[in-house]
Amino acid sequence: MRVHPRDNETVNETWISDRDRFSYEGLNSEDRLTSPMIKRDGAWQAVEWEEALILVAERLKAAGDDQIGCLVSPSATLEEMYLAQKLVRGLGSNHIDHRLRQRDFRADAADPVLPWLGLPIAELEQQQAVLLVGSDIRQEQPLLAHRVRKAALDGGAVALINPYRVDLTHPSTQLVGAPDAMLADLGAVAKALGNDGLGGSQPGDAHQRIAEVLKAAGADRKGIILIGALAQSMP
């Protein structure tokens, strides 16, 4: 068995990452569930689908409307999500969500209905400055990581603010700090870039270094800030 990329030059350049090329091996993993399981006397037991569905129906009926919740994978299809919310709302509950990694929802009203990069994927490699905040981009989005790498190899500056140092295949400037300090670090970098309206965020040497790198590369204001999954999971 082999996995090949779909021919879509503007998105993937007919390229596929190792992560995605070999992901099919999970089909044969010993850890993969192949049948429903029910916990009895503290131990998981494999059962037939009919038995599992009957138990689920009984548990849902026994629970009150406000005690039913549903978490849907964000990679589920539109049809799967529609059916999931139809089922949950039919049971009298509105507790359904797909934001499984997000912890802070205070800015939801300001978020776009359809989040996107703000530019075509192909233009990412043309950026003179890229700032990644809370992102292990090679693991999260290999296709974007490839574009960022091309930008770096073309002379663009790539800087990262993360709770740990990530493994990249191109030059970068990385600021590593505590997870709960990422917001303060970002504010300090912004202040070092000339934004004085950020209160008490005082830039240190590391913040100044990132600011200088971004300033030097982004003289034509061609830059982008990318927020990753690590940042989304932080409060």
Residue ranges, per PLM feature:
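Catalytic alpha/large subunits of respiratory electron-transfer oxidoreductases
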Residues: 1-235
